[in-house]
């Protein structure tokens, strides 16, 4: 049993849990202005069960590609034996359904709409016949929805409407999510082609994809600087993603795996930028 739990948690990418829980918690706190039981319920859901489902479904149906991908098998993606696939799918359902029921019951119609979109995006990204991850450009839009929707749910679940400034911030976050998905796809161009999988990177090539990623990161940084001071500090923090990806501006399909160096930096940049945002918000609140 403990081994099964270990494999399930490994598949859920613990290093990336913060990418979904933090947006929900931050948006909830900014809009509701308080911490209550619903806040903690959402944090727990988007921290672990949500990621078990999102990455678990992906690992099951991407198995043939993952076994050909040298970077899979650690923090960047588990390669679970086929004997564990049914367990992983059951865990995805069992761990999420109770939370979803409560979030639907105690949420608003708007948060329920975003929650429905979020769940559908998680399933559609990897599930057979839908496979949005194999539909170029739709793959980036869907992946970004995985990370932006928790923030939208957090911002609307208490009945308070997001401000214009929050919508701008969410727009910047959505651009960041698209850029990040494209960056991740660059390193997998050859592995995906060998497995006959399509992605935005396999269609426009590694170089085109990395350059698009850089542009989207830059747009995200510019958009957030349109917010009142001191939002420009966050814009500067986002530029670290631009510099990280731009190092591989002239990458080729043959050398696409080199982009993994950028991806490894990206994983830790999330913590750095998250810390900058947190410290900035605390400072503003104290002022």
Swiss-Prot record:
Q: Where in the cell is it found?
A: Cell membrane
Catalyzed reactions per annotation: all-trans-lycopene + dimethylallyl diphosphate + A + H2O = nonaflavuxanthin + AH2 + diphosphate; nonaflavuxanthin + dimethylallyl diphosphate + A + H2O = flavuxanthin + AH2 + diphosphate
Write down the membrane topology.
Answer: Multi-pass membrane protein
InterPro entries associated with the record? Prenyltransferase_related, UbiA_prenyltransferase, UbiA_sf
UniProt enzyme class = transferase
For this chain, one GO molecular function annotation is: transferase activity, transferring alkyl or aryl (other than methyl) groups
Disulfide bridge positions per record: none
Q: Which domain of life is it from?
A: Bacteria
**What is reported when this gene is inactivated?**
Disruption mutant accumulates lycopene and shows altered carotenoid biosynthesis.
Please state the pathway this protein functions in, per its UniProt record.
Answer: Carotenoid biosynthesis
Which EC numbers does the record give?
A: 2.5.1.149
Q: Name one Pfam family in it.
A: UbiA
Recite the UniProt keywords alphabetically. Cell membrane, Membrane, Transferase, Transmembrane, Transmembrane helix
Query: Which CDD domains does the UniProt entry name for this protein?
Result: PT_UbiA_4 (cd13966)
Q: Does the keyword Transmembrane apply?
A: yes
Transmembrane annotation, as ranges = 15-35, 37-57, 97-117, 137-157, 166-186, 218-238, 265-285
Its GO CC terms?
plasma membrane
Function comment: Catalyzes the elongation of the C(40) carotenoid all-trans-lycopene to the acyclic C(50) carotenoid flavuxanthin during decaprenoxanthin biosynthesis. The enzyme acts at both ends of the substrate, forming the C(50) carotenoid flavuxanthin via the C(45) intermediate nonaflavuxanthin.
Query: Would you identify the family this protein belongs to, as annotated?
Result: Belongs to the UbiA prenyltransferase family.
Q: What is this protein called?
A: Lycopene elongase/hydratase
From the broadest rank down, the organism's phylogenetic lineage runs: Bacteria, Bacillati, Actinomycetota, Actinomycetes, Mycobacteriales
